[in-house]
Amino acid sequence: MPTLFSGAKIAVLCDGRLLTYLRDDLPTIPWPGLWDLPGGGREDAETPLQCALRETREEFGVSLDPAWIVWERAYAGQGMNGLDTWFYVAEVPVGTFDQVVFGDEGQRWMVSSVEAFLAMPDAIPHLQQRLRDFLSAHP
């Protein structure tokens, strides 16, 4: 696994439903006002998985078990400064979404069907594609 990466995102799935949030609508942030998945930028010397899990805790108040990760992939050179980004998929137990305590980033959160997220015109396009990559590898 490369030691340099810019960040990680994670699709948190439960019975075909997906945890999402609407980003703040600020011109100073990437992808303002679009639907997003948990995750964000690397801090200190954390691994990509540690980054994704920490961001999920910070943004949604949910601690994910690393054993729930069912897929991971590095996307070379697609992050800040040309660094890699990582994308994870976690299949979580029923009831996990009931534990959400939404943090202070974003306007609101929502659980949607995977199909609805993939069809959203106002979702971050490369995250929709990464979720499609997972689905094509796990039909």
Tell where the protein language model's regions lie, with residue ranges.
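Unchanged
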Residues: 40-66, 73-127
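N-terminal strand-loop-strand
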Residues: 1-36, 64
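Residue-level signal for pocket-adjacent positions within structured domains
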Residues: 26, 30-32, 37, 70, ...
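Residue-level detector of intrinsically disordered, flexible termini
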Residues: 7-10, 89, 115, 136
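Intrinsic-disorder/low-complexity coil detector
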Residues: 1, 26-31, 92, 120, ...
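General helical structural elements
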Residues: 13, 27, 46, 58-61, ...
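Charged phosphate-binding loop/patch that engages nucleotide di/tri-phosphates or the phosphate backbone
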Residues: 126-139
